[in-house]
């Protein structure tokens, strides 16, 4: 699984508008990261996804957290116990 995750991280970073990607488990443990997103961000990203999920009563509704700034967006979503964050530069 680790090799597959590493390949997905590398493939994601091939997109020129993406400058960072991070995967974390539900405990905030960094499973892998590239670019602008690092180990220090894993806990916060995991908690943001968990807190956003509490805002909906529909368990099948999986929210996307989007942090916007002038320099770009960080999109965060949880998938089957793994939270993925992607840092995309503004176009």
Swiss-Prot record:
Residues with PTM N-acetylmethionine: 1
Organism field: Homo sapiens
The family this protein is said to belong to: Belongs to the LAMTOR5 family.
Main subcellular location: other
Pfam families assigned: LAMTOR5
Keywords from the UniProt entry: Acetylation, Cytoplasm, Lysosome
Name of the featured protein: Ragulator complex protein LAMTOR5
Tissue localization of expression: Highly expressed in skeletal and cardiac muscle, followed by pancreas, kidney, liver, brain, placenta and lung. Elevated levels in both cancerous and non-cancerous liver tissue of patients with chronic HBV infection compared with hepatic tissue without HBV infection.
Entry annotated with the keyword Acetylation: yes
Source species, domain of life: Eukaryota
Any one annotated GO CC term: protein-containing complex
Subunit details: Homodimer. Part of the Ragulator complex composed of LAMTOR1, LAMTOR2, LAMTOR3, LAMTOR4 and LAMTOR5. LAMTOR4 and LAMTOR5 form a heterodimer that interacts, through LAMTOR1, with a LAMTOR2, LAMTOR3 heterodimer. The Ragulator complex interacts with both the mTORC1 complex and heterodimers constituted of the Rag GTPases RagA/RRAGA, RagB/RRAGB, RagC/RRAGC and RagD/RRAGD; regulated by amino acid availability. The Ragulator complex interacts with SLC38A9; the probable amino acid sensor.
A biological-process GO annotation: cellular response to amino acid stimulus
Cited InterPro entries: LAMTOR5
Role noted for this protein: As part of the Ragulator complex it is involved in amino acid sensing and activation of mTORC1, a signaling complex promoting cell growth in response to growth factors, energy levels, and amino acids. Activated by amino acids through a mechanism involving the lysosomal V-ATPase, the Ragulator plays a dual role for the small GTPases Rag (RagA/RRAGA, RagB/RRAGB, RagC/RRAGC and/or RagD/RRAGD): it (1) acts as a guanine nucleotide exchange factor (GEF), activating the small GTPases Rag and (2) mediates recruitment of Rag GTPases to the lysosome membrane.
Gene that encodes it: LAMTOR5
Subcellular location field: Lysosome; Cytoplasm, Cytosol
Keyword flag Membrane: no
């Amino acid at each position: 699984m680790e090799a597959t995750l590493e390949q997905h991280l590398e493939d994601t970073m091939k997109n020129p508008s993406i400058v960072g990607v991070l995967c974390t488990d539900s405990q905030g443990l960094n499973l892998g990261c590239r670019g602008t997103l690092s180990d220090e961000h894993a806990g916060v990203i995991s908690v943001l996804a968990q807190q956003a999920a509490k805002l909906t009563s529909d368990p099948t509704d999986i929210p996307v957290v989007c942090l916007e700034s002038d320099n770009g967006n960080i999109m965060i979503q949880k998938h089957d116990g793994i939270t993925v964050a992607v840092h995309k530069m503004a176009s």
